[in-house]
């Protein structure tokens, strides 16, 4: 499909990313409709996915997304926790509508409920866990794009992108590649320049592991410096009462020394 155009061909750097993220490793079971995407079967029973066909389907899915005039009419869905962060990041960079977490039954078919939506295209992370929106999309003729493993059912799925959708790194990488290809087809970014958004932003992070990393980072920090108390010389305080000379106060008259008159008369007699 993209083999005729060299500009759309799979690059070596992208192949390396897929191999490191174990995108090529499928499950031990194979759905009969997914046999065309299986390259071979390993001795331990794990099926190897053909990454060339994975890339062709990814480019086809990106072209379908770009064909929608209003990007908000494209709904990206992930009920599994490992794909919720990738879905939110994809929606942020492509202006699509995310549904991360539990899907409300009847959102595409029940016009009475407030959560009713009418999307024009769905992109789901796993056909098994996201079976409810896929089923409702089939009732109202909404095309569906899905990341599928070797054992995923392809019922009501229009474009299947074969990959390892059970690995957090693999599913994060696939959403990152799809977002980059959508932006390239829109002309937002150039193919000659590397996309500055790193793929790590699309990876799922376990909350417990994130807390452990933060705690380990705090332990590596140097301890805060404690300022030692400096002994300053204590100045001698002087008693101002001693320096001030006592003022000489005049003699105090004793009022008892005055002669007490015993009569109201002029001579003092009764």
From Swiss-Prot:
Q: What is its main location?
A: cytoplasm
Instruction: Please name the GO terms that the record assigns under molecular function.
Output: ribosome binding; structural constituent of ribosome
Q: Which GO terms describe its biological process?
A: ribosomal small subunit assembly; translation
Name its cellular compartments: Cytoplasm; Nucleus
Which is a Gene Ontology cellular component entry for this protein? cytosolic small ribosomal subunit
Q: Where is this region: Disordered?
A: 251-270
Q: Give the highest taxon in the source lineage.
A: Eukaryota
Task: Give residue spans, biased composition: Polar residues.
Answer: 261-270
Keyword set, alphabetical order: Cytoplasm, Developmental protein, Nucleus, Ribonucleoprotein, Ribosomal protein
NCBIfam families xref list: uS2_euk_arch
Q: Which family does it belong to?
A: Belongs to the universal ribosomal protein uS2 family.
**PANTHER family in the record, alphabetically?**
40S RIBOSOMAL PROTEIN SA
Q: Quaternary state and partners of this protein?
A: Component of the small ribosomal subunit. Mature ribosomes consist of a small (40S) and a large (60S) subunit. The 40S subunit contains about 33 different proteins and 1 molecule of RNA (18S). The 60S subunit contains about 49 different proteins and 3 molecules of RNA (28S, 5.8S and 5S). Interacts with oho23B/rpS21.
- Listed name of the protein: Small ribosomal subunit protein uS2
């Amino acid at each position: 499909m993209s083999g005729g155009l060299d500009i759309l061909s799979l690059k070596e750097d992208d192949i390396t990313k897929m191999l490191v993220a174990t995108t090529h490793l499928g499950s031990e079971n194979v759905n009969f409709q997914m046999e065309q995407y299986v390259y071979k079967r390993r001795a331990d029973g794990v099926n190897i996915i053909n990454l060339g066909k994975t890339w062709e389907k990814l480019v086809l899915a990106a072209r379908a997304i770009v064909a929608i005039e209003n990007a908000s009419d494209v709904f990206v869905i992930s009920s599994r926790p490992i794909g919720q962060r990738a879905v939110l990041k994809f929606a942020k960079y492509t202006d699509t509508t995310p549904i991360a977490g539990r899907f409300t039954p009847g959102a595409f078919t029940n016009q009475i409920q407030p959560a009713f939506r009418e999307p024009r295209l769905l992109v789901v992370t796993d056909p098994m866990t996201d079976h409810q929106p896929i089923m409702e999309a089939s009732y109202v003729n909404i095309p569906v794009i899905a990341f599928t493993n070797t054992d995923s059912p392809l019922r009501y799925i229009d474009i299947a992108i074969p990959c390892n959708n059970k690995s957090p790194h693999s599913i994060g990488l696939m959403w990152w590649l799809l977002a980059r290809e959508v932006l390239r087809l829109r002309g937002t970014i150039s193919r000659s320049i590397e996309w500055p958004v790193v793929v790590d932003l699309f990876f799922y992070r376990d909350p417990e592991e994130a807390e452990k990393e933060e705690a380990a980072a705090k332990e590596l920090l140097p301890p805060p410096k404690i300022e030692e108390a400096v002994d300053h010389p204590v100045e001698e305080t002087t008693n101002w009462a001693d320096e001030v000379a006592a003022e000489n106060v005049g003699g105090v008259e004793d009022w008892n020394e005055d002669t007490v008159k015993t009569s109201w008369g002029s001579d003092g007699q009764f």
